[in-house]
Amino acid sequence: MRDHIVIKGARENNLKNIDVEIPRDALVVMTGLSGSGKSSLAFDTIFAEGQRRYMESLSSYARQFLGQMDKPDVDSIEGMSPAISIDQKTTSKNPRSTVGTVTEIYDYLRLLWARVGVPHCPKCGKEIRRQTVDQIVDQIAALPQATRVQILAPVVRARKGEHQKVFDDARRGGYVRVRVDGSIYDLTEVIPLDKNRKHNIEIVVDRVVIRPDQNRRLTDAVEIASALSGGLVLADIPEEKREILFSQNYACDDCGISIEELTPRMFSFNSPYGACPTCGGLGTRLRIDPALIIPDPSKSILDGGITASGWNSVKGDSISRMYYEALAEKYHFDLTTPIGDLPENVREILLYGTGDEELTLHYDTNRGAGVLRRPFEGIVCNLERRYQETQSDAMRASLEDCMAETACPDCRGARLRPEVLAVTVGGLNISEFTALPITEELAFLDSLELSEKDAKIADSILREVRSRLQFLQSVGLQYLTLARSAATLSGGESQRIRLATQIGSSLMGVLYILDEPSIGLHQRDNEKLLATLRELRDLGNTLIVVEHDEDTMRAADYLIDIGPGAGVHGGEVVCAGTPEEVARCERSITGQYLSGKKKIPVPAHRRTGNGHALVIRGAAEHNLKHVDVEIPLGVMTCVTGVSGSSKSSLVNEVLYKTLVGKLNHAKVRPGKCDGIDGVEYLDKIINIDQSPIGRTPRSNPATYTGLFDDIRALFASTQDAKLRGYGAGRFSFNIRGGRCEACSGDGLLKIEMNFLPDVYVPCEVCKGKRYNRETLEVHYKGRNIAEVLDMTVEEALAFFQNQPKIRDRLQTLMDVGLGYVKLGQPSTTLSGGEAQRIKLATELSKRSTGRTIYVLDEPTTGLHVADVARLIDILDRLTDAGNTVLVIEHNLHVIKVADHIIDLGPEGGDAGGNIVFTGTPEDCARCTESYTGKFLKKELES
């Protein structure tokens, strides 16, 4: 067996026909500047080829459903293993996905609660026991005399298939009718069923009229139904349109409530047998939120204080104004009074209506004038009714601006039916258990006392649950709960969850490719992650990790530095070897930082700010413990703390959402806090994250930064364009006129290939240039619009040197290190770090007011140390212009250059949410209670 993976002639994206040898069964780290070609080699070449070879081993029928990957642009790869990619882009946004379901721990928990759970009555809480035939008969016989009852035997419950054998058996048993999915059929007819849908089938055993002389017949029917269905009896009362399910398995004597024998699917919130019927297993419902109807209570009704659709007009002839005036007349208030100052009962009436009390409405329209008398339903009730009744997607979207997710009123966020939540193990129901942090769940399982019989049943289940929980703990996720929605996880958290799942699978001989697993991880937990990676390697696997973290690089068995620059300046193997060998390589920028020849300097002076501050009072969102925080304005503040210490809750949920509502007038529900003081010193808040700058290939750096508008205007001002009568719109590939209509301005045509992957071919008409022939005949300095879009930022800067407006925008893109990016490069091909730097460049090109607060959540994601140095320069420029920069960060290079630090903790989850330290980095390094301070001290001293 080969001891190396040998790659020859890799040319994917910007790779320059490189040859690489990667040792097998080793921890291999690939590093290099953002855009240097690391991901092109690791994911687009090695992983893509591993996946493609696996797909080729399948039948063409299977490939039709799975899709197939293109062969990467590489001459050969030898020594490949089956490849598994663990990246950050596959976080599930499905509201039904939780940490428990993603890790499959919840499947084991469902089995545990079904096998050893103790059922209780959901009404009285009494432990439930099985029902006998006599008890079932007595309850049916207690119905009003002359009631008609059908006794049914549920033989198939929510199972796919045609079930013809069930019908044949029923015919042979002498039965005449069955009920299928709620409809009665005669067994003499053919009953066709869709085998791909789930069906419910009940055999009609007897039809009984409740009378004293029918007890014998009723008993026989119940016994037969129970025997047919394995203990279940369904009493259908057609006149009352209701059914009663009885079980010889479990029932409450006092309340008469029956439940089926416990099965794992009853504990699934994704199954109709377990899901709360009110919210369908989501745990939340979209409800009209009064805070989004009246986002600013300091405004009056006439000042536009009510922003809800249909109620935001205060024109004299509007229906809403007619209602407001009638309400003001009846309840004696002024429409110019701030809504927050109105009496409590008036605000209640505005939102929830007058009940049966009528208003006197005066109308005056083109059709005439008059008086109406009618009650007022209230803005909240009106919006909820319109939301339920409308068929318009646009109206639904408009009304959702006033809605917020609230806990389901019935299950209170637990997602399951009441009878399922009444089943306990060790005194906890399954929802209560999954709401515990992982550390507490492990402690609960260790102290769980079961009977000898139950302990034997649960032994193997508990072993699996424990090992998976311990894996999550080993990758630094001990603060998470299994009930946590997967959609709320950061990229780093979701990646480490999948990493823990892979360790649990104990596979050997696999090639794992990971994308920055250290993201979002505090230095304190880094060693745990490295131990996990080593464990995965020691099982006999090869790990290729794309990473910039210095600790991970030093822990590698083999380090590959791709570069030397980014984009067209990268794509080569600068150096490959042990970390010590790379550190000695003069040509390697990574090596220079590893050896200490290059470093990011600590600033000689810290900014002290403009004397003003934002003060957050009583922040209590998620795990925050009613903390008060002061954020100085005019400086760069770094919010730090271990993973799960509530950094994002404080900055993104409380601060950002409150300020974006007040300053940018956005409709969002902010996190819980008593208030924020000092907002008057700011005029806007901007969140610069790593989300894509566009979702389609039509979006590119030129369109996002506004550069393309200036370039189109320049082309429209040329002599060629004026002679032809072309305006700036002629040079857009998004509208008819100048674009190529054969490909609608895409430059590519998609050819569907059925069981082969879709093929994208250049448009035969425009040859991929996006524009029609006439548009491409217009030139500026000898170049047409398509040729300009194909330029890199660096080339364009030289080309447009005499156009100050365009030159300045291009210069900011150069300043943020994006000289290698093409102006027309589709936004879908940009990395998160590149997208973020384009946003930063756009902000740098704007005229600063000095009153803006910029929020960045882990901006160093995907950035090499050299890129981090450039990022720090940009943040310094924004701060030096008088603005405030607030950064959530674990990267010590950023933390050490901050003017002010807010350290949260001390731990993650419930043990976090407190302010551990505030002050300068030097003072933080001296704080013994701060984990950040301990690592910062080493960084400042180095």
Predicted regions and their residues:
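Conserved phosphate-binding elements of NTP-dependent enzyme cores
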Residues: M1-S942
